[in-house]
């Protein structure tokens, strides 16, 4: 071994990709600021097992529950309660619907179809 590290991998983002990323970040900041859990101790949301169901109660009346769920599903977040869903519930949805490209779109269509938020 030469003792040298390989060069860091560069990412070639186009201007359009940078704009999309900044728009996504701005949209995320906007909904996160409305989340009911924003002042909650994170330890209450990052629990294991049956305690997750109790933690999900915090989400029930949250105005951005759908955005939160979509963000967690799009980013395949493995831990914690997000958008009123436990880790197990998110894994099940991801497994049942591997074809979904945008969970935001999917959840919005489902909401319109069923007339519910979840």
Swiss-Prot record:
Binds 1 [4Fe-4S] cluster per subunit. The cluster responds to both O(2) and NO. Following nitrosylation of the [4Fe-4S] cluster binds 1 [4Fe-8(NO)] cluster per subunit. Keywords: 4Fe-4S, Cytoplasm, Disulfide bond, DNA-binding, Iron, Iron-sulfur, Metal-binding, Transcription, Transcription regulation. The gene is whiB4. It comes from the Bacteria. Residues 36-92 form the 4Fe-4S Wbl-type domain. Homodimer in the presence of reducing agents; the oxidized apo-form makes dimers and trimers while the redeced apo-form does not. Upon over expression in aerobically grown M.smegmatis, apo-WhiB4 forms trimers held together by disulfide bonds. This is Transcriptional regulator WhiB4. Pfam families: Whib. It comes from Mycobacterium tuberculosis (strain ATCC 25618 / H37Rv).
